[in-house]
Amino acid sequence: METWKAVLLLAAGLLCGAWRWRSREKRRYRRSVYRAETGKQYKKVEENRGMDGEYRTSLELEKRIRGRRYFVFNAYIPCRSGGSTETDIVMIHEKGIFVIENKNYCGQVRGRANREYWEHILPGKRRTFYNPIYQNQGHVRHLRRLLGEHGYHLPMVSVIVFNDGVKRLRVKMAGSDAILCRSRRAASKINRRLRRMEQVLDEAEMEEVYGILKAQTRPFWWVRYGQRKRAEKLQKKAGKI
């Protein structure tokens, strides 16, 4: 009987601890920039790996990036040829624009900055995926053109972030000036780059750039559909290699 009591007390303690942890996570989410900008419910973000990865990365940046900054999530940037390309996170900083491609993977990632496809390795399984540096170069190019049309010609930094489920990140970055890191080191890497940059935007200009990009976060359904189909096509191509 005493054993059963001990088991029940242990189970109750674990459940209580889990409830308190979840409540604390929900409170933190409600106060986050990600929630304020996207309006998404915690449960939806928690159940979606992509959204959860973007949220975890943005939390790190929100807490530790120095200087004035704004965040824009999931902007659909128009392409010259028609259609659009979707950015994960754009950080508008007084010293420039940081275009962040977020990957919520686990296991190992291997590749080279100048190779078109990289490897994602899990126990007993390997798959290829499109080089996120190349992917983000497209985002930067279209974003540069969009802001240029509004008279803004700003320094832009490409940042590739893998969430901390990736235990080994083996990528040779020779020839690339992009930032590549896991999410727990994203803020320190970006702060290091910021120390080499000069201020280019005042508060009013930052707000204007924010408004330009924020207007791109609520596309018509067919814009989202076209972007999803292009992503699926690219992934199918990677799977054949």
Kindly give the residue locations of the regions a language model identified.
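Active-site beta-strand-loop-beta-strand hairpin of nuclease catalytic cores
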Residues: 92-117
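Short, basic/glycine-rich phosphate-binding loops at helix/coil junctions
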Residues: 36-38, 115-122
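Surface-exposed interaction regions that form or flank ligand-binding interfaces
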Residues: 1-85, 96, 125-241
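Catalytic metal-binding acidic patch
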Residues: 86-92
